[in-house]
Amino acid sequence: MTKDEFLAEWHNDNPRILVHTSGSTGKPKPLMVEKRRMLNSARITCDFLGLKPGDTALLCMPLDYIAGKMMVVRSLQRDLRLTSVRPSSHPLADETLPSFTFAAMVPMQVYNTLKVPQERERLMRIRHLIIGGGAISDELAQMIKPLPNAVWSTYGMTETLSHIALRRLNGPDASLWYTPFDGVGISLNADGCLVIDAPEVCAEPLVTNDIAQLRTDDRTGKTLFRIKGRKDNVVCSGGIKIQIEEVEETLRPHLSEPFMIVKKQDEMLGEKAILLTESTDLTHIEEICRNTLPKYWVPREFLHIDHLPLTETGKPKRSGAF
């Protein structure tokens, strides 16, 4: 979808607009969402970051998904001067680009940009950079820490019309815990999954598939949260519950080749964890796992795959990985 096509849809008489989920947990699903709630979401983000009319913004993500659409809506809501570039893994490659007040990228775009000195300099001139659409790896987090500008990780999904919480990745306010926006209530259900009550962007409370931990900020009294992993990424293996994201986080500093953990039905164990990797040295991978992971976290199988399956937005596509 082009920006002109989106704007034509935005300015028509229909109070709703069609969006699609990213497909990280299955086939992308269409959703009809209210334009007024998208404007509410845009206003909340712009207020949080202190964006003002005339500030500059960069659109470098596809308009097929909510993240790209919301960048346009924020520019409309706050009268930002929006520059569009073709979505790519190097969004700041053009040396003629101006400095920006605000931009949103996925982790892969930030990682690739920071690897190129000239592009890194341009990224450092973005006053507020928000990163969403995937996990922040340990390596990327370390690359972000020394940056002088404000860099944030977002939490949200298509159903919440982009993000409902941010956490700072660098500077004195850096944290592992997300701070919800004003007007957003959070709680846990009986399964330990995050429940979001954000009436300005969602008509009903939303029960997520994200297993979370809550705590109260001593300074502000706000309830903060940390995501441990997805409920559907729990492997129930021989009576032991294994959170896939926690296994991957533990292994990431030790494995240089791309990898992911998936699960598969097993007659004896119920389910078993399998490590997929682009490396061909499976013996070495298994040795690292046995030396690094708790005994019951060690995958039961190790398989080579030429290219790990990813969604269009760069998230692991675990469903149907075989």
Predicted regions and their residues:
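AMP-binding/adenylate-forming
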Residues: 33-40, 56-112
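AMP-binding/adenylate-forming catalytic core of the ANL superfamily
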Residues: 209-297
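Gly/Ser/Thr-rich phosphate-binding loop
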Residues: 116-172
